[in-house]
A protein has these predicted regions:
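Membrane-interface extramembranous regions
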Residues: 1-119
Length: 119
């Protein structure tokens, strides 16, 4: 039986990935303008979130799924920076929380590493 930490990671990433397919336009808004094909990036990142979320449930692939999620968290970090630097484009979200997401990303990376990647 997977640990509570693994189950929480799986639920969080799988739900976030599914959300990319339910509300793709919302996620496309946070893609920095210098990146091409925002909708494609939303669908690709959503698929990887789902794959990683499910993958951490299986001990045989947990290590690789964890590293995939860490790489994904690093890959989407520019979107978090874009949001923090352009709060006027995200007026429904408190500005302080846009900045709080930046260090939170590293907390998530540490969580994934400890739960799924550590030997």
């Amino acid at each position: 039986m997977p640990s509570l930490s693994i189950l929480a990671l799986a639920a969080m990433f799988t739900a976030a990935g599914i959300a990319h397919f339910i509300w793709p336009a919302m996620f496309a808004r946070i893609v920095p303008p210098y990146l091409p094909a925002p909708m494609a990036l939303v669908y690709i990142s959503g698929a990887f979130e789902i794959a990683g979320g499910i993958g951490v449930l299986f001990p045989q692939v947990r290590f690789w799924a964890g590293w995939g999620l860490i790489l994904l968290l690093l890959a989407v970090f520019p979107a978090n920076i874009h949001m923090a630097l352009n709060p006027e484009a995200f007026s429904r979200i408190p500005g302080w929380s846009l900045w709080a997401r930046l260090p939170l990303q590293f907390v998530l990376i540490a969580w994934v590493y400890v739960a799924a990647c550590r030997p």
